[in-house]
Amino acid sequence: MAGPGWGPPRLDGFILTERLGSGTYATVYKAYAKKDTREVVAIKCVAKKSLNKASVENLLTEIEILKGIRHPHIVQLKDFQWDSDNIYLIMEFCAGGDLSRFIHTRRILPEKVARVFMQQLASALQFLHERNISHLDLKPQNILLSSLEKPHLKLADFGFAQHMSPWDEKHVLRGSPLYMAPEMVCQRQYDARVDLWSMGVILYEALFGQPPFASRSFSELEEKIRSNRVIELPLRPLLSRDCRDLLQRLLERDPSRRISFQDFFAHPWVDLEHMPSGESLGRATALVVQAVKKDQEGDSAAALSLYCKALDFFVPALHYEVDAQRKEAIKAKVGQYVSRAEELKAIVSSSNQALLRQGTSARDLLREMARDKPRLLAALEVASAAMAKEEAAGGEQDALDLYQHSLGELLLLLAAEPPGRRRELLHTEVQNLMARAEYLKEQVKMRESRWEADTLDKEGLSESVRSSCTLQ
């Protein structure tokens, strides 16, 4: 029953205490179960008298959706009850507050922290997308932190959520203007892709401290939403190329040009495949078993590739592990595998240099045969520049970028090249360059994995979040 006065209402089986927040038609309280477990929960109290037809529909949709889903990064609906005055949604309690407060008390988040958080949100969004559910009100205020010590994000407040197939279109305005996709305001016609825009705004705010349409007045906000100007990213702080690429593709005003859901989930910066999970260690171990087998067979290149792939899973396994003793054991193993990978790298690098020298005569002949093809000759020059960068110490990333640029051109030219000797030489050169690019990509990844493992060797993820995000 609801209690009199201005205090929290009374609900059988629970003791409601402090108010956590309130919205248009609901107030959320922290509560304790009266059972022996004394479980802490959050109870969303919705006053029946405040409900109109639209808000009743929103509430019923929220209950229907949350009843049927379980995901580590979506707030769990444990139960719901009602009495003559209120409807009560008994939810999982998240002690860390919301993402908006977390960002603003730290001003901005480092890219590595933002990436971990974005992986968690992308995982929840993928889960919803597979079930044709669109949230339609994604914003930092609707994203909760499980705690401040070891924060995990939890998507909350499904009041505007809808069952929407990718091809469904809606016309009813929903969401918060700062995080709303432009087509919701400008065309009043939208589909599930509006959630991708909102993810871009959330990431932008995490990295730069405010959303891209931050305004002093509603008229200024409306002008920014209706403008056709491209969303420009600040030059500071410095961000990785992949991070900037993702932001620009999420914050594309035209939904037909916006990144697709599948490309978002597969984007190298999101990298859901390597998200910390209970499966990370098993996948790393399976790859190491294969690497050791190839190593014993004398296939150094295959062994190196498998060790590098294993490291890509060992790092998230370290993030996921909470037991200090098991974490130390994983770190020790990672150190061994990195050392062996470095030895194999020297062997493979020496072999690759020999192959490059052997291929010089064929490469020179191809260049001679390309004299009447300026575009082909230019692409081969870029490939030569990539090789030179590769031989220079510390030039792996620049070399990889040049290889990828060259291959982008050469693959198109190969497809258009008529049969003949030049086509044969070009095909061989493309195969060689692709192998070099793949090898370099693994070296860059291995270096990043080793750096991250070394970082974890000094402090856990929660410490890293606290120390790197806290204002001095």
Curated annotation (Swiss-Prot):
Interacts (via protein kinase domain) with SUFU. The active site is at residue 137. Residues 14-270 form the Protein kinase domain. It is an enzyme of class 2 (transferase). InterPro entries: Atg1-like (IPR045269), Kinase-like_dom_sf (IPR011009), MIT_dom (IPR007330), MIT_dom_sf (IPR036181), Prot_kinase_dom (IPR000719), Protein_kinase_ATP_BS (IPR017441), Ser/Thr_kinase_AS (IPR008271). It catalyses: L-seryl-[protein] + ATP = O-phospho-L-seryl-[protein] + ADP + H(+); L-threonyl-[protein] + ATP = O-phospho-L-threonyl-[protein] + ADP + H(+). Its EC number is 2.7.11.1. Widely expressed. Highest levels observed in fetal brain. In adult tissues, high levels in brain, liver and kidney, moderate levels in testis and adrenal gland and low levels in heart, lung, stomach, thymus, prostate and placenta. In the brain, highest expression in the hippocampus, high levels also detected in the cerebellum, olfactory bulb and optic nerve. In the central nervous system, lowest levels in the spinal cord. Induction: Up-regulated during senescence. ATP binds at residues 20-28, 44. Disulfide bonds: none annotated. It comes from Homo sapiens. GO terms for molecular function: ATP binding; protein serine kinase activity; protein serine/threonine kinase activity. Residues 280-348, 375-444 form the MIT domain. This is Serine/threonine-protein kinase ULK3. Keywords: ATP-binding, Autophagy, Cytoplasm, Kinase, Nucleotide-binding, Phosphoprotein, Repeat, Serine/threonine-protein kinase, Transferase. Autophosphorylated. Autophosphorylation is blocked by interaction with SUFU. Belongs to the protein kinase superfamily. Ser/Thr protein kinase family. APG1/unc-51/ULK1 subfamily. It is found in: Cytoplasm. Serine/threonine protein kinase that acts as a regulator of Sonic hedgehog (SHH) signaling and autophagy. Acts as a negative regulator of SHH signaling in the absence of SHH ligand: interacts with SUFU, thereby inactivating the protein kinase activity and preventing phosphorylation of GLI proteins (GLI1, GLI2 and/or GLI3). Positively regulates SHH signaling in the presence of SHH: dissociates from SUFU, autophosphorylates and mediates phosphorylation of GLI2, activating it and promoting its nuclear translocation. PANTHER family: SERINE/THREONINE-PROTEIN KINASE UNC-51-RELATED, SERINE_THREONINE-PROTEIN KINASE ULK3. The keyword Nucleotide-binding applies. One of its GO terms (biological process) is regulation of autophagy. GO terms for cellular component: autophagosome; ciliary tip; cytoplasm; cytosol; phagophore assembly site; phagophore assembly site membrane. The modification Phosphoserine is found at residues 176, 300, 350, 384, 464. Its main location: cytoplasm. The keyword Oxidoreductase does not apply.
